[in-house]
């Protein structure tokens, strides 16, 4: 029995194989195995990215939103056909942004660990897998990180500032609280040393984000909102917006 040639495989079937892969390294490897695989990847990059992306990135929707705004801020037209540009540039930038998010989250976890060592943060027995940050809390951190970065991108580009205002006006009080808390941590409580990721929490984009988020949060507090919070012994220096056991305090804020 003869073995069918790859050229006889319908592109739709090859596309489904790409979409079932676990990460983009597997996508790249498969694309290099034959011309038909390479061309299928180039021609169907958009649906492949949307299928594989959520398995690679936490908060993929927010990651794509950030990338879209970065491209708009830089005047880059977003490809409509899912062609070669999306198959290379967009994926590479998504991965670069994700490395920045991971580096920031790791820095936050280290911050929590230091506070626990100093006796300023007690999450449970030493060595417990939930001592510092649970997966759900890391996901909450990443969501806010991408959102704050997106706000900074929009606010630092004159033609996108109205989008930043709309974004913040549509945030829930809980989301706005997390944005303000992350801005406070990012500006005041980290060394801004993220190696080769290229992340700089003091550049003009991030500073623009901090400023506008602080403006909106202060405006909310001026409306007479109370500022609930748990005992400082159970949070690192009063930060509480990302932890599972303190979410009930965020729910105490009144809607805007």
Positions of predicted regions on the chain:
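Charge-dense, low-complexity intrinsically disordered regions
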Residues: 246-256
């Amino acid at each position: 029995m003869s073995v069918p040639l790859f050229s006889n495989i319908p592109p739709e079937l090859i596309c489904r194989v790409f979409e079932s892969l676990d990460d983009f390294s597997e996508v790249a490897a498969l694309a290099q195995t034959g011309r038909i695989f390479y061309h299928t990847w180039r021609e169907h990059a958009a649906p492949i990215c949307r299928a594989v992306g959520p398995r690679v990135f936490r908060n993929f929707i927010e990651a794509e939103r950030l990338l879209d705004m970065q491209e708009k801020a830089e005047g880059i037209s977003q490809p409509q056909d899912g062609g070669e540009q999306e198959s290379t540039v967009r994926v590479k930038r998504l991965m670069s942004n994700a490395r920045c998010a991971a580096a920031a989250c790791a820095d936050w976890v280290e911050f929590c660990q230091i506070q626990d060592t100093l006796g300023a943060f007690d999450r449970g027995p030493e060595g417990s897998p939930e001592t510092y940050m649970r997966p759900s809390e890391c996901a909450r951190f990443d969501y806010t990180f991408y959102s704050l970065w997106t706000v900074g991108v929009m606010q630092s580009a004159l033609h996108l500032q109205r989008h930043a205002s709309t974004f913040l006006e549509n945030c829930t009080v809980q989301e706005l609280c997390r944005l303000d808390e992350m801005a406070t941590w990012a500006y005041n409580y980290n060394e801004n040393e993220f190696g080769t990721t290229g992340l700089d929490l003091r550049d003009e984009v991030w500073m623009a984000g901090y400023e506008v988020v602080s403006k909106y949060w202060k405006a909310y507090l001026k409306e007479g909102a109370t500022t609930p919070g748990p005992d400082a012994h159970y949070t690192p220096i009063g930060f509480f917006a990302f932890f599972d056991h303190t979410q009930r305090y965020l729910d105490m804020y009144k809607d805007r």
